[in-house]
Amino acid sequence: MAVVEEQVVLRILDANLDRAREGVRVVEEWLRFGGGPGESLAECKALRQQLGRFHTERLRAARDTPHDPGTGLEHPDEGVRSSPLDVVRVNFARIQEALRVLEEYAKLVQPDLAAAAKEWRYRVYTLESTATGGDLRTRLAAARLYLVTSPHPELIEIVEHALAVGLPLVQLREKEAPARAVLDIALRLRDVTLRHGALFIVNDRVDLALACGADGVHLGQEDLPLARARALMGPRLLIGQSTHAPAEAQQAVADGADYLGVGPVYATPTKQGRTPVGLEYVRHCRESIERPGFAIGGIDRSNLEAVIAAGAERIAVVRAIMAAEDPGRTTAWFLERLNRG
């Protein structure tokens, strides 16, 4: 390889080591101050230090920023970020692209860097999933049935029966109980959902969701603004939003909701005084909203087919399971019908 070509390759390696290190630092800062998983923060720090060890004086000496034609190039999207989670995801993409460039060009002059970049790239894929809740969001997208609890003396037992037959998602909804009592229930539900491999969400209370180690929180229209909740919870955990009209659904997506509650479809004592939105809103969300949506409100065996016919792939229920004579069998029936498609 000619000397001029080698200098170009060294400049490419220098630029992309800078790019990767800067991207890692952006992610690391959010994990540090935004409450991300401790293991992800440690992984970021280790990766940044490893990148630094390969950023030698030889590579730095090849730098020629004044004559780099790429420094003045900009794209309109580069000046726009919708949320901290968006910042984190953009920078993960930047890291992955830089590592791929390092992997390819380092083969020409520094094979050990090429091998390391390949290993790092696959580690970053896993790190992104862990740090941004990709694993949680994948499981959320696969969920078809969502149990929202109501106060009951045998609440834990009912939920366990439902989990035993495959219920993938549970929300603790306790509107009246004192915070300490709710936390006690939440800790017990967190334990049983972990044992059964199910997602666990807490209604309304970001503080209690964090205190019990839940997978996320569900917010109503009058609860803490979603952006504030995200700032407290970090990018990994799930945030759901109740919606009752197309404008609310669009706003929830714009605010970064991971999933939507779509309802109430039918009249329900859980939402006393609220006019049902009907099946048309279910149809609208299925056709127009690019987020998982759970139809909710008065759904039971008698009307499930109509809800599915309106386009619902996912439903949330309260009384249909909480008040069932056999919660396990009822849950199994819903799962079988929903998974049939």
UniProtKB/Swiss-Prot annotation:
Residue ranges, annotated region (Thiamine-phosphate synthase): 124-341
PANTHER family: THIAMINE-PHOSPHATE PYROPHOSPHORYLASE, THIAMINE-PHOSPHATE SYNTHASE
Organism: Gloeobacter violaceus (strain ATCC 29082 / PCC 7421)
Single GO molecular function: magnesium ion binding
InterPro entries documented for this protein: Aldolase_TIM, ThiamineP_synth_sf, ThiamineP_synth_TenI, ThiD2, TMP_synthase, TMP_synthase_cyanobac_bac
EC number, as in UniProt: 2.5.1.3
Superkingdom field: Bacteria
Protein family: Belongs to the thiamine-phosphate synthase family.
Pathway annotation from the record: Cofactor biosynthesis; thiamine diphosphate biosynthesis; thiamine phosphate from 4-amino-2-methyl-5-diphosphomethylpyrimidine and 4-methyl-5-(2-phosphoethyl)-thiazole: step 1/1
A Pfam family assignment: ThiD2
Residues that bind 2-[(2R,5Z)-2-carboxy-4-methylthiazol-5(2H)-ylidene]ethyl phosphate: T268, P269, T270, G298
DNA-binding listed as a keyword: no
Cofactor: Mg(2+)
Residue numbers spanned by region Unknown: 1-123
Protein name as catalogued: Thiamine-phosphate synthase
Record's catalysed reaction(s): 2-[(2R,5Z)-2-carboxy-4-methylthiazol-5(2H)-ylidene]ethyl phosphate + 4-amino-2-methyl-5-(diphosphooxymethyl)pyrimidine + 2 H(+) = thiamine phosphate + CO2 + diphosphate; 2-(2-carboxy-4-methylthiazol-5-yl)ethyl phosphate + 4-amino-2-methyl-5-(diphosphooxymethyl)pyrimidine + 2 H(+) = thiamine phosphate + CO2 + diphosphate; 4-methyl-5-(2-phosphooxyethyl)-thiazole + 4-amino-2-methyl-5-(diphosphooxymethyl)pyrimidine + H(+) = thiamine phosphate + diphosphate
Biological process, per Gene Ontology: thiamine biosynthetic process; thiamine diphosphate biosynthetic process
Gene giving rise to this polypeptide: thiE
Described purpose of this protein according to its UniProt entry: Condenses 4-methyl-5-(beta-hydroxyethyl)thiazole monophosphate (THZ-P) and 2-methyl-4-amino-5-hydroxymethyl pyrimidine pyrophosphate (HMP-PP) to form thiamine monophosphate (TMP).
Residues reported in the UniProt entry to bind Mg(2+): D204, D223
